[in-house]
């Protein structure tokens, strides 16, 4: 088995159901040929294409990292060429030979990286909330000081 990654771009005008069908069919090609999907990520939104393709300036990106056979890659690319929903695709071979232990390690590494990213995002959000609270507190203090100054009577001195 070898490790590959494929990114493919789907038409932005497709329904969510059709997008999911294309993704499921693509993943099924890999799994049916005794492959393993290490990581896949649909973009979830249309993004601008750097180059216009088939008169479309946007697309729905899907990234897939997997271990499979060359036959599975050939079949997947054959279907991409036939499928009108796929605007572009590209497959890159990452490793010629990968063992089951290396696959599990890659899956674990990706899970750890995702957990670290999630933790960092939560920490950043907490820090942002803390900053907002401090700013609100300072604004409230200044408003209170201004109110006290306005409420205090001004003594006029006679000369």
Curated annotation (Swiss-Prot):
| Cellular-component GO terms for this entry | cytoplasm; ribonucleoprotein complex; ribosome
Q: Which residues cross the membrane?
A: none
The entry's function note states: Binds together with bS18 to 16S ribosomal RNA.
Query: Which molecular function GO terms apply here?
Result: small ribosomal subunit rRNA binding; structural constituent of ribosome
* Keywords attached to this entry: Ribonucleoprotein, Ribosomal protein, RNA-binding, rRNA-binding, Selenocysteine
Q: Which InterPro entries match?
A: Ribosomal_bS6, Ribosomal_bS6_sf, Ribosomal_S6_plastid/chlpt, Transl_elong_EF1B/ribsomal_bS6
Organism expressing this protein natively: Desulfotalea psychrophila (strain LSv54 / DSM 12343)
- UniProt-listed GO biological process terms: translation
Family of this protein: Belongs to the bacterial ribosomal protein bS6 family.
Specify the protein name: Small ribosomal subunit protein bS6
Q: Which CDD domains match?
A: bS6
The protein's matches in Gene3D superfamilies, at most eight in alphabetical order, are given as: 3.30.70.60
